[in-house]
Amino acid sequence: MNSKGSQNVATTCKPVTTFVQTDTNTFREIVQRLTGPTENNAAAATPEATVIKTAIQKRPTSKLHERRQCMRPKLEIVKPPLSFKPTGTTPSSKSGNTNLLTSPVGTPSSLFSNLSLIEGEPDSCTTNIEEEEKAIKERRFYLHPSPRSKPGYTEPELLTLFPLTSPNSSGKP
Protein backbone atom coordinates (compact mmCIF):
# COMPACT_ATOMS: atom_id res chain seq x y z
CA MET A 1 0.00 0.00 0.00
CA ASN A 2 1.58 3.27 0.95
CA SER A 3 4.06 4.19 3.64
CA LYS A 4 1.38 5.60 5.96
CA GLY A 5 -0.71 2.39 6.15
CA SER A 6 0.28 -0.83 7.83
CA GLN A 7 -1.37 -4.24 7.83
CA ASN A 8 -1.36 -6.97 10.51
CA VAL A 9 -1.99 -10.54 9.37
CA ALA A 10 -2.42 -13.63 11.55
CA THR A 11 0.16 -16.29 10.75
CA THR A 12 -1.61 -19.38 12.09
CA CYS A 13 -4.67 -19.22 9.86
CA LYS A 14 -6.14 -17.33 6.95
CA PRO A 15 -6.88 -13.81 8.15
CA VAL A 16 -10.52 -13.29 8.92
CA THR A 17 -10.15 -9.57 9.63
CA THR A 18 -7.66 -7.15 8.13
CA PHE A 19 -6.56 -4.27 10.34
CA VAL A 20 -5.44 -1.11 8.54
CA GLN A 21 -4.26 2.12 10.11
CA THR A 22 -4.59 5.18 7.90
CA ASP A 23 -5.51 8.85 7.92
CA THR A 24 -8.77 10.36 6.65
CA ASN A 25 -7.26 11.55 3.35
CA THR A 26 -6.18 8.11 2.13
CA PHE A 27 -9.03 6.10 3.67
CA ARG A 28 -11.15 5.99 0.49
CA GLU A 29 -8.19 4.92 -1.63
CA ILE A 30 -7.30 2.08 0.75
CA VAL A 31 -10.91 0.88 0.91
CA GLN A 32 -11.08 0.82 -2.89
CA ARG A 33 -7.83 -1.14 -3.09
CA LEU A 34 -9.04 -3.69 -0.55
CA THR A 35 -12.54 -4.13 -1.98
CA GLY A 36 -11.66 -4.11 -5.68
CA PRO A 37 -12.16 -1.81 -8.66
CA THR A 38 -14.90 0.80 -8.76
CA GLU A 39 -18.01 0.37 -10.95
CA ASN A 40 -16.71 2.86 -13.54
CA ASN A 41 -13.47 0.91 -14.02
CA ALA A 42 -15.34 -2.40 -14.24
CA ALA A 43 -17.74 -1.09 -16.91
CA ALA A 44 -14.88 0.30 -19.00
CA ALA A 45 -13.09 -3.06 -19.22
CA THR A 46 -13.94 -5.37 -22.13
CA PRO A 47 -16.00 -8.48 -21.35
CA GLU A 48 -13.28 -10.84 -22.67
CA ALA A 49 -10.67 -9.28 -20.42
CA THR A 50 -12.88 -9.66 -17.36
CA VAL A 51 -13.55 -13.32 -18.16
CA ILE A 52 -9.83 -14.00 -18.43
CA LYS A 53 -9.08 -12.04 -15.25
CA THR A 54 -11.73 -13.86 -13.26
CA ALA A 55 -10.55 -17.25 -14.51
CA ILE A 56 -6.96 -16.48 -13.56
CA GLN A 57 -7.61 -14.66 -10.29
CA LYS A 58 -10.38 -16.94 -9.06
CA ARG A 59 -9.25 -18.73 -5.94
CA PRO A 60 -11.18 -21.48 -4.25
CA THR A 61 -13.20 -19.76 -1.57
CA SER A 62 -13.08 -21.26 1.85
CA LYS A 63 -16.41 -22.34 3.23
CA LEU A 64 -17.73 -21.29 6.59
CA HIS A 65 -17.22 -24.66 8.26
CA GLU A 66 -13.59 -24.73 7.04
CA ARG A 67 -12.90 -21.31 8.54
CA ARG A 68 -14.49 -22.31 11.82
CA GLN A 69 -12.34 -25.43 12.03
CA CYS A 70 -9.26 -23.34 11.51
CA MET A 71 -10.22 -20.91 14.26
CA ARG A 72 -11.42 -23.50 16.79
CA PRO A 73 -8.88 -24.57 19.41
CA LYS A 74 -8.04 -28.23 19.51
CA LEU A 75 -9.49 -30.23 22.39
CA GLU A 76 -7.63 -33.16 23.80
CA ILE A 77 -9.37 -36.00 25.57
CA VAL A 78 -7.17 -37.62 28.16
CA LYS A 79 -8.21 -41.14 29.00
CA PRO A 80 -6.95 -42.85 32.14
CA PRO A 81 -4.53 -45.73 31.61
CA LEU A 82 -5.93 -49.26 31.46
CA SER A 83 -4.25 -50.16 34.73
CA PHE A 84 -6.17 -47.47 36.60
CA LYS A 85 -6.83 -48.50 40.18
CA PRO A 86 -8.81 -46.16 42.40
CA THR A 87 -7.14 -45.42 45.69
CA GLY A 88 -8.45 -44.04 48.94
CA THR A 89 -6.86 -40.63 48.35
CA THR A 90 -8.88 -37.61 47.36
CA PRO A 91 -8.35 -35.87 44.02
CA SER A 92 -7.01 -32.82 45.82
CA SER A 93 -4.06 -34.77 47.19
CA LYS A 94 -0.80 -34.58 45.29
CA SER A 95 -0.80 -38.16 44.00
CA GLY A 96 0.65 -37.22 40.64
CA ASN A 97 -2.69 -36.65 38.91
CA THR A 98 -2.80 -32.85 38.74
CA ASN A 99 -5.26 -32.65 35.83
CA LEU A 100 -8.28 -33.21 38.08
CA LEU A 101 -9.92 -30.11 39.48
CA THR A 102 -11.78 -30.15 42.75
CA SER A 103 -14.76 -28.04 43.60
CA PRO A 104 -14.17 -25.39 46.26
CA VAL A 105 -17.60 -26.21 47.69
CA GLY A 106 -17.00 -29.93 48.06
CA THR A 107 -19.40 -32.77 47.56
CA PRO A 108 -23.00 -32.64 48.74
CA SER A 109 -22.35 -35.45 51.18
CA SER A 110 -19.62 -33.42 52.88
CA LEU A 111 -21.89 -30.38 53.04
CA PHE A 112 -24.71 -32.23 54.75
CA SER A 113 -22.55 -34.42 56.99
CA ASN A 114 -22.44 -31.76 59.72
CA LEU A 115 -26.21 -31.41 59.85
CA SER A 116 -28.10 -33.14 62.59
CA LEU A 117 -31.79 -33.61 63.25
CA ILE A 118 -33.08 -32.09 66.46
CA GLU A 119 -36.30 -33.46 67.75
CA GLY A 120 -38.75 -30.70 68.55
CA GLU A 121 -39.17 -29.83 72.20
CA PRO A 122 -42.03 -27.64 73.42
CA ASP A 123 -39.59 -25.09 74.88
CA SER A 124 -37.66 -24.74 71.61
CA CYS A 125 -40.89 -23.89 69.77
CA THR A 126 -41.67 -21.02 72.12
CA THR A 127 -38.10 -19.73 72.01
CA ASN A 128 -38.24 -19.71 68.21
CA ILE A 129 -41.45 -17.69 68.30
CA GLU A 130 -39.94 -15.28 70.82
CA GLU A 131 -36.81 -14.88 68.70
CA GLU A 132 -38.94 -14.29 65.63
CA GLU A 133 -41.02 -11.64 67.39
CA LYS A 134 -37.86 -9.98 68.70
CA ALA A 135 -36.38 -9.86 65.19
CA ILE A 136 -39.62 -8.42 63.81
CA LYS A 137 -39.64 -5.67 66.45
CA GLU A 138 -35.98 -4.81 65.87
CA ARG A 139 -36.58 -4.37 62.16
CA ARG A 140 -39.82 -2.47 62.83
CA PHE A 141 -41.85 -4.89 60.78
CA TYR A 142 -45.11 -5.78 62.40
CA LEU A 143 -47.52 -8.42 61.23
CA HIS A 144 -50.97 -7.10 62.04
CA PRO A 145 -53.67 -9.69 62.64
CA SER A 146 -56.47 -9.93 60.15
CA PRO A 147 -59.67 -8.07 61.14
CA ARG A 148 -61.62 -11.20 60.25
CA SER A 149 -60.00 -13.08 63.10
CA LYS A 150 -61.37 -10.66 65.73
CA PRO A 151 -64.52 -11.68 67.60
CA GLY A 152 -67.71 -9.94 66.53
CA TYR A 153 -66.55 -9.55 62.95
CA THR A 154 -69.36 -9.35 60.43
CA GLU A 155 -69.13 -9.57 56.69
CA PRO A 156 -68.90 -6.17 55.02
CA GLU A 157 -72.08 -4.83 53.45
CA LEU A 158 -71.94 -4.97 49.67
CA LEU A 159 -73.18 -1.85 47.94
CA THR A 160 -75.22 -2.16 44.78
CA LEU A 161 -73.52 -0.63 41.79
CA PHE A 162 -76.52 -0.99 39.50
CA PRO A 163 -80.18 -0.61 40.46
CA LEU A 164 -82.09 -3.85 40.85
CA THR A 165 -85.24 -2.43 39.26
CA SER A 166 -85.65 -0.12 36.32
CA PRO A 167 -86.98 3.37 37.15
CA ASN A 168 -89.24 3.25 34.05
CA SER A 169 -90.93 -0.01 35.06
CA SER A 170 -91.74 1.13 38.59
CA GLY A 171 -93.61 4.28 37.47
CA LYS A 172 -95.61 2.80 34.56
CA PRO A 173 -97.51 -0.53 34.42
Swiss-Prot record:
Keywords: Nucleus, Phosphoprotein
Annotated stretches, region: Disordered: 76-105, 143-173
Motif extent (VQ): 27-36
Polar residues bias (residue ranges): 86-105
Modified residues annotated as Phosphoserine in this record: 92, 103, 146, 149, 166, 170
Span of the signal peptide: none
UniProt xrefs under PANTHER family: VQ MOTIF-CONTAINING PROTEIN 11-LIKE, VQ MOTIF-CONTAINING PROTEIN 31
Official protein name in the record: VQ motif-containing protein 31
Species the sequence originates in: Arabidopsis thaliana (Mouse-ear cress)
